[in-house]
From Swiss-Prot:
Nucleotide-binding found in the keyword field: yes
The keyword tRNA-binding is annotated on this UniProt entry: no
Modified residues (N6-acetyllysine): K442, K1241, K1301, K1645
UniProt superkingdom: Eukaryota
Gene responsible for this protein: MYH10
Protein known as: Myosin-10
Biased composition (Basic and acidic residues): 1129-1149, 1698-1708
Omega-N-methylarginine: residues carrying this PTM: R18, R1930, R1940
Amino acid sequence: MAQRTGLEDPERYLFVDRAVIYNPATQADWTAKKLVWIPSERHGFEAASIKEERGDEVLVELAENGKKAMVNKDDIQKMNPPKFSKVEDMAELTCLNEASVLHNLKDRYYSGLIYTYSGLFCVVINPYKNLPIYSENIIEMYRGKKRHEMPPHIYAISESAYRCMLQDREDQSILCTGESGAGKTENTKKVIQYLAHVASSHKGRKDHNIPGELERQLLQANPILESFGNAKTVKNDNSSRFGKFIRINFDVTGYIVGANIETYLLEKSRAVRQAKDERTFHIFYQLLSGAGEHLKSDLLLEGFNNYRFLSNGYIPIPGQQDKDNFQETMEAMHIMGFSHEEILSMLKVVSSVLQFGNISFKKERNTDQASMPENTVAQKLCHLLGMNVMEFTRAILTPRIKVGRDYVQKAQTKEQADFAVEALAKATYERLFRWLVHRINKALDRTKRQGASFIGILDIAGFEIFELNSFEQLCINYTNEKLQQLFNHTMFILEQEEYQREGIEWNFIDFGLDLQPCIDLIERPANPPGVLALLDEECWFPKATDKTFVEKLVQEQGSHSKFQKPRQLKDKADFCIIHYAGKVDYKADEWLMKNMDPLNDNVATLLHQSSDRFVAELWKDVDRIVGLDQVTGMTETAFGSAYKTKKGMFRTVGQLYKESLTKLMATLRNTNPNFVRCIIPNHEKRAGKLDPHLVLDQLRCNGVLEGIRICRQGFPNRIVFQEFRQRYEILTPNAIPKGFMDGKQACERMIRALELDPNLYRIGQSKIFFRAGVLAHLEEERDLKITDIIIFFQAVCRGYLARKAFAKKQQQLSALKVLQRNCAAYLKLRHWQWWRVFTKVKPLLQVTRQEEELQAKDEELLKVKEKQTKVEGELEEMERKHQQLLEEKNILAEQLQAETELFAEAEEMRARLAAKKQELEEILHDLESRVEEEEERNQILQNEKKKMQAHIQDLEEQLDEEEGARQKLQLEKVTAEAKIKKMEEEILLLEDQNSKFIKEKKLMEDRIAECSSQLAEEEEKAKNLAKIRNKQEVMISDLEERLKKEEKTRQELEKAKRKLDGETTDLQDQIAELQAQIDELKIQVAKKEEELQGALARGDDETLHKNNALKVVRELQAQIAELQEDFESEKASRNKAEKQKRDLSEELEALKTELEDTLDTTAAQQELRTKREQEVAELKKALEEETKSHEAQIQDMRQRHATALEELSEQLEQAKRFKANLEKNKQGLETDNKELACEVKVLQQVKAESEHKRKKLDAQVQELHAKVSEGDRLRVELAEKANKLQNELDNVSTLLEEAEKKGIKFAKDAAGLESQLQDTQELLQEETRQKLNLSSRIRQLEEERSSLQEQQEEEEEARRSLEKQLQALQAQLTDTKKKVDDDLGTIENLEEAKKKLLKDVEVLSQRLEEKALAYDKLEKTKTRLQQELDDLLVDLDHQRQIVSNLEKKQKKFDQLLAEEKNISARYAEERDRAEAEAREKETKALSLARALEEALEAREEAERQNKQLRADMEDLMSSKDDVGKNVHELEKSKRALEQQVEEMRTQLEELEDELQATEDAKLRLEVNMQAMKAQFERDLQTRDEQNEEKKRLLIKQVRELEAELEDERKQRALAVASKKKMEIDLKDLEAQIEAANKARDEVIKQLRKLQAQMKDYQRELEEARASRDEIFAQSKESEKKLKSLEAEILQLQEELASSERARRHAEQERDELADEIANSASGKSALLDEKRRLEARIAQLEEELEEEQSNMELLNDRFRKTTLQVDTLNTELAAERSAAQKSDNARQQLERQNKELKAKLQELEGAVKSKFKATISALEAKIGQLEEQLEQEAKERAAANKLVRRTEKKLKEIFMQVEDERRHADQYKEQMEKANARMKQLKRQLEEAEEEATRANASRRKLQRELDDATEANEGLSREVSTLKNRLRRGGPISFSSSRSGRRQLHIEGASLELSDDDTESKTSDINETQPPQSE
């Protein structure tokens, strides 16, 4: 990153400091406090920590102030861990909810980070201040970068769209949406700035004359449009009051080739009035502030307060100067290419708009007529616009209007005049704005390069909600609604449809964001019509007002879900629409006027005829406006006809805007949209303030959360199979075999080779889909792979170059040796006399032969020169011909290119027109058939309608025949009059259409006459060129075919003209027939209905004929355009050289033939021809003007043709939409009809059944009431049971909470053991804890839901039982009906009971509704939990992805480990080889030592031979003094011997150097071996120590865990004791056991997750080891580099030694020369001076050489030894030299040698100095670099060791944790076993209790039997007593027996009975009294 200076650092507003965010303290605080989000009125959401859970409510403590509050569980939202703070993409959030999204946006906004990704789109919050993040440096930062490589920015979105456009060849669009003031316009400008910088064409093109002109103009288009189209509003200081779609075209290489701007709905009413504290358009204030005095006088400008249209005067904008902005606008216009006249004309129009507002009218005293008391302002206005003042005043005050067929002057009222002036001002400004946009498009589209694709930038007016909103706000909000629907459809519907279309696994998710109902409310054409359709419909009706429009709207749409009546502003607003951004109240004031946009056509005509060409150009289409007379006629009968006088060309503002919006939507659907959601932070326009509720509302409306969710759950990235294989096959080189393979199979193989998690991708039919981030990961791996390949390629290239350089050096070295050897040989031979003789004699031997050869060569040379001159001539001729042919070829190529271009254009135009014609014909046929079908359906509906009306009429006649007849007659009279008026209006319309057709016919006849006149002029020209024609008749024959084509087209034109005339006459006849029919209608009122149908049918026929006529006219225009194009092409070819005459002759022939045809047809043309022959001279002069006008007409015809085609296509689209709506409405009506019929039947059945039931229920209601009370009792019991179950559930939940608390305690203990693992382990534990809580909560809710469902089922069963009882009662009621007929009072009581029962039923239904509401609430909770579960599943997928990545890293690490093992083995082999080489070098050193000894012996032998030779030489010199020549030869031989000695010495030194080098290498190897051994020993020792430490830690952990296990056992015992208290109910215990089982499963899952985490950490440890090994490998590589550098140093030393040897050799020669000079000085005194001078020079050289020798002492020592030896030899030689007669020759020779030696010495000195300095500096630099590398590697090695120690420590902790988890698992297993045992024991107890109960039941049954026996005995005794009594009465035998106890025993016939005395007495008395006299 470049170093930045200054106060404002851009990185502060782009990047997040992750070191601050990854703070362990905040992470621990978050984990400990269990932080969540709760709702807050002030902050939206506040952070709080959970303290206690109380059922459905939770006690929380606010983090900010510590206050406590009770919050419902459903209102709590989870908080993300602190590591997700300020995350760049909100799709990465773990907990996705509104609170987290708002908190993230708020944190980033307060940190200056305004851009945030939200899945696939970007969210930007308006900062309300300037940020330094839009400079060119920032653009370069984002250029060419992928989205995930840089922080969020609008530049990243632009870069992504630009790259997608280039790669996919797909058009892109960037949609900036949001409310007004959210920053859409500014972001649009930044997009254009980025694209203009990145895709600038001048950077890569040399043919651009003005660098970047197009880009500069593109950038300057915005300031111009903002000046004329933006204004200050309450919400925004630079609010766009129009919409624009900027289309930037690019060529195939990505350069900008042009641009185009489309605008939508300028708010022109702002030009005449503004709301409070708002301004009009900027240009007015800029002009009044920035214009100079001269300009002000020209434009007649005044002060701000002098203009009525500036409602609020001058309101400055903070931070902006209107004067400076005016200068910028003018500069932008100049850059855009506006001329000075154009700018001045525009400013005149702006000034005239202000002058319109100053025109004042006055009401006349006695009439309502308006008058203009002072026309000063009118004079100024007319001066500016080029009009006549009197005509303007007359047109305003008394305009001419059409009444019937005549025009009359109508006086205007003051209100009408004011309205007309305001309408003209608005229309003038709107036309100026349209012209400005057209002019900018013309400047931007001037290039001829064809755009391959485009990027569209949409900047539309933002959503606006004012207190009262008008028609402009409706259009703006309608547009934003459509854009939001496009976003929803693109993000949610199309995305999921593509999943289903590709056949991947996907469950369709309905996000509930369909805005189509609101859009239909606004734009639906019928059934029922929408707002715009009703507005258009009201515009067509006479006497329609805004009030009637609102009434009709309420009538048609009052029941719509998105339509409401205003509640707050009932008196002010008219209706309310519920948009996606909120409710908007609309006031329908002047909506009909705004929709029609009427103008004073008298003034418009004056403006069209203005003397100012610019103003006339603005008002050129005055025939399309709606006149004010038409609007004023709305209250009269002529309004309808006046409104339709323009041949159907008039379109309302709503229709035009709707159609343009439809086109925009179609364009956007054909592009790949990139959404930028702009958010407004506050309404005060304050920086640094964010209103949370406002932002939340915008996020909800924009579907941000849903977009993030589908991005996370879906597969947003997709790529086709072929592209995937082509792009990522580099990652799987051997996965796909050679040969053909299907794309899908290849992708599947690649995916398997990439080892991707199956959850991360889906394979469709034609594409492969990826989750978010996967494709970016593959891109990174691909980049890394390519980087590795490039690095390897570079290494191979460097190796190749190094080997090549080494081979070259080897060749140079061998060449140097050859040169040295040859030089040495030459030095030996050059003083040898025979050599001199040989060199002198040898050339002489070849002289004679050379002369002969020279003569032969001269002859050959002459021949060759002759041939050369001949060939050069031929070559010049050939070059000349070649050049000529090239020129001809270029000319032909140009001609061919021009012809091909013309042919291609013509062919393309023909094909396009033919396709359009075919398409339009098909559409026309389709529409005709559809119209026929619709007419048939309409006829059927009309018949049905008539039947219904007849039925209604019959009913009305039955009620009141007399009144009905009178009303019917009155109604028929009124309808007949209305229809007669309507038919009259239609007749007037048809008459106007007929007149229009006549005018067009005349226009076409005039154009044909003009064409014929032009042909005659061309004929005159052809007569003048008749002589030339004779010369060019050959060319004419080639062009006869084109002439025939011209004749055919002319004949077709004539046929079309005649056809048009015939159709016009037919139309006139049909109009006459219609008039006759209307007369008949007036006479025959009784048959009005049938005649109306006939007239409507004929009207449809007329419209068909009209369309056909229009089609014919368009075809004629197209043919004329084709003729004109052919004419232009011929004219262009005529302008070329030597072709003008031929073209004229061709035209002559064509004109002749056409003239002959015209002479044959009419005699009038003959007269015209003679007349034109007389005027030929004048026509020649006017030819150019006529051609220009002709071209203008052709252009106009083209434009009209294009507009006609567009209108036809729009009509077709409207017809299609209308037909589709009709079909939909028909289907809806049919379904409604069926539903109503079914409902009627059902209601009838229900009525009959209810009556029947009422009669049956009257009798038995009391009994039913008793049953109902029984049902109530059952319900109460069920409620008690439910409460009991709820209490049990609460108990179970408390137990679960206790278990969770214990689990939390265990997690905290584990966290204490894992404290050094810091953030990661704590996060994982917290996530698992949350998952456990969530799962337990889900289970609890599911149990509650199941209990409620059971309760509901029980109630349903009770209800069914009641129904059965009711049925039984009904059956009984039929039987007892006769009995209760007389009991009327009972019936009344039953009625009251029935009412009471109904009340009870209502109470029950209310309770049922409450239960349903509770169920709905549970369903909502379930959906919320389901969403959270989805988020957790996404996180789980993310964790799985991480695990798979770690597994991949493990595999890579294994591969690296294997490679390292191979490398270590290779190093071992190299070590063995090095040892072997060392041994070899030792042997070699020994052999070299022996060779050295042998060399020394040879040298001694040579010295001995030398001494012998010297002795011989002395003898010879002493014997013969006259043989000086022999002395010289002997000296030569001595020198040769000395040279041999020197060579032997050098060889000896080289051998010594090699020996030393081998010894050094041996020492280095030994040192390396010792270091490696020490390293291995240290590694082994550290591993042993680590293992021992791990063992000790594990033992310690085991002990600690045993203690914890004991504690757990105690706690478990306490838990079992508490459980025993809860063992009253077996079901409660089973629920607890089930919960414990589930908890065990969760714990086991957690254990598995922790084991997986342990594996992950082991993988990380192994990765750390791998990194350590890599560091070691790098250190070894650096050692290798060091060795190579040492080898280079040795090589340099060798080169230094060789240079030193060369220097010694030179010094030796110098010494020899010095000795010879000294020896010769004894004989010749004359040479002493020269000798002294040479000695001084030699001494100087010796000093310099001694300075050079100071760096290498060893070499100097050797050099001194050798010099001493040489000196001794020289002294001996000098003593032997006694002869002086050769001194002169010797002196001369010495002088020559001295000169040569001087030159050599100078060269050697320079070379040696430079070489020594260069080598020394290079070596010093290398040594310094190596030392730095060594230090760096030492630091890295220390860091790696530290990292290894840290990871090993972490590994120990992980092992401890694993052991803890294992112990926990064992504990849980033991607990589960105990629980199972306890459950078995309880089951046994239950069985025993059941047995006891059975025993008790048996005893009870036994007692019951005994009791029954006793009762039976008692009954028997009572019977006996009764028999006894009877017998006593009869006087039977009775015997008594007394006992001691006073009791007596009574014996009666064998039976005995004990009685007391009293009893006996009483009994006997009774018996005696009742005893009769005995008969026996």
